[in-house]
Amino acid sequence: MKIYRTKTFDSAHILKLPYESKCADSIHGHTWRVEVWIEGIPNEYGMIFDFQKISNIIDTLDHKFLNEIQGLEQPTAENIVLWLIKRIKESLSDGFKLKVRVWESPNSYAEEEITVRRKFEL
């Protein structure tokens, strides 16, 4: 079974790039759109994952200067995807699938899809 959640957040950032770019060397803002898909087996409460938990994680980025958030010192769409995956997967069981897509604009997004694998030590 799969669940899906989408949510927007507004934030500012600046990118440090070795070439000239609209997003480089100038603080600017975006209304980002995040999409999250989680696939797995529902728990004893009939839920794969609580939608509110997804919203709470995304809300930590809302109305922030992203460069000041630990782990987002270079806040590209790609790095925001990885930052979100790291936080969401902490609450997922082994074998669950997670996909996160972050839209920087109506025409541009980054996404990553993973299968959660826990490493067991003997």
Residue ranges and their predicted role:
Residues 1-122:
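Charge-rich, low-complexity N-terminal segments
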